């Protein structure tokens, strides 16, 4: 069983991101922190929530969670060039419909996400992600979006609903 939470949508700009990260790596090294690549990968996410006063408002609708995220030295850091390059590669490869080695086509897959999560690219792209998994052979794939929630659905005010739904899904699949 696989539960995928807050997955990014297919990104047509991923290949450009890979190339730009490769150039940046040659210029500055793999461990360089590039604000340009951060803007390229995450910059558009905060735009919808600009009036909320935090560049991390896209993560969660709960202000306390966002403040805690900002205050934590373990969160909110900028990726290295190498990490950005891997992120762009994952974005490119994840929704490619060729090259999959299907070991367990009966694997139950559940996509969950916040309806307001800019990372998923909207309900249409979220549905396309679910369909991609079905097209590559994982036929028992379902998706559920949670209204009013953003990227960190497990930290939202109504997170108990998400926990409850995932628990019910697991119990159903395991016949518990």
Language-model features and meaning:
Residues 1-74:
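Alpha/beta-hydrolase-fold enzymes
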Residues 1-9, 71, 99-100, 128, ...:
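Soluble, non-transmembrane catalytic domains of enzymes that act on hydrophobic metabolites at membranes
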Residues 80-101:
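Active-site nucleophile elbow and catalytic-triad environment of alpha/beta-hydrolase enzymes
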Residues 103-109, 136-139:
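Short, proline-enriched alpha-helix->beta-strand connector loops that line the catalytic pocket
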Residues 111-113:
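Short beta-strand/loop motif that positions the catalytic acidic residue
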Residues 115-118, 149-150:
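Acidic beta-to-alpha connecting loop that harbors the catalytic carboxylate
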Residues 118-128:
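Conserved alpha/beta-hydrolase "acid-adjacent" motif
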Residues 134-176:
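Catalytic active-site module of serine/aspartate enzymes centered on a nucleophile-bearing elbow/loop
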């Amino acid at each position: 069983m696989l539960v995928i939470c807050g997955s990014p949508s297919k990104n047509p700009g991923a290949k450009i991101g890979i190339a730009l990260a490769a150039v940046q790596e040659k210029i500055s090294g793999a461990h360089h922190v590039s604000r340009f690549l951060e803007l390229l990968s995450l910059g558009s996410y905060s735009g919808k929530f600009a009036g909320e006063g935090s560049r991390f408002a896209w993560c969660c609708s709960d202000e306390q969670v966002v403040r805690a995220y900002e205050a934590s030295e373990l969160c909110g850091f900028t990726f290295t060039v190498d990490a950005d390059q891997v992120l762009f590669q994952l974005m490119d490869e994840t929704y490619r419909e060729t090259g999959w080695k299907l070991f367990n086509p009966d694997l139950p897959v559940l996509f969950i996400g916040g309806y307001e999560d800019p990372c998923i690219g909207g309900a249409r792209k979220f549905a396309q992600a679910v369909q991609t998994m079905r097209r590559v052979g994982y036929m028992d794939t379902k998706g559920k979006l949670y209204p009013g929630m953003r990227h960190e659905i497990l930290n939202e005010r109504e997170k108990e609903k998400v926990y409850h739904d995932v628990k019910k899904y697991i119990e159903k699949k395991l016949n518990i």
